[in-house]
Amino acid sequence: MQPLAERLRPKTLDDYIGQKHLVGPGAILRKMIDAGRISSFILWGPPGVGKTTLAQIIANKLETPFYTLSAVTSGVKDDARSIFSKGRPILFIDEIHRFSKSQQDSLLGAVENGTVTLIGATTENPSFEVIRPLLSRCQLYVLKSLEKEDLLELLQRAITTDTILKERKIELKETTAMLRFSGGDARKLLNILELVVESDTEETVVITDDMVTERLQQNPLAYDKDGEMHYDIISAFIKSIRGSDPDGAIYWLARMVEGGE
């Protein structure tokens, strides 16, 4: 069974939550997508704000072949050469900042002549992590952290539309803890909701802040100091500090220490 975050992944822009400055009515990226014409661009924003989802929605909307490359698992030059022959596809590169200079260099020709439309996603400042020639050939769009209203909308959508959760009686009595522990990350928020619901055997699941805190202490979410969660949790830790949230900061710090940081 797919995780809740994957089951709830939006398929259209109308279902996409947040980033109204980019995909809301009349916004620049929305106009390009509706017109069926996009150029290569890079999405820069924190984890869990919809970068990958937006790229997939664009590919579906334009009915264009969609391919993904990973710096960790791909032999970029060989894989890219194969993709470039697929008829002007969209190439999505998540965490493009992890690509080496030579890996990024290998994309320049295809991006410049339009053989491929590149959509890169990064949590790091592209000015420092993406080579200048590639950055100059791409538009840069900044994705913002999800607002409280966005996260609450996502929670309501989850408990009312998900094929599994809607079969349960779920009452969101309190949401402060879930929002705080999510660090503004939609994927993390849904993971927390799924954990809390699955661990409750009552006929009606009444979600409170104390309940969420207790469940997370009993079932700490995964942390791998050498993997992707390392960066996600550091990001949540920094957001808690900036947001003057001492409880959240202590929680994320404890997660890092427990994980061997």
What are these regions (language model features)?
Residues 102-136:
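Conserved catalytic/switch belt of AAA+ P-loop NTPases
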Residues 70, 139-152:
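Conserved AAA+ ATPase "SRH/arginine-finger" region at the nucleotide-binding site
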Residues 176-181, 187-201, 211-217, 235-239, ...:
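C-terminal helical "lid" of AAA+/P-loop NTPase domains
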Residues 1-46, 249:
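Pre-Walker A (pre-P-loop) alpha-helix and adjacent loop at the N terminus of AAA/AAA+ ATPase modules
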Residues 22-26, 64-91, 101:
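Short glycine-rich substrate-engagement loop in P-loop NTPases that contacts/grips substrate
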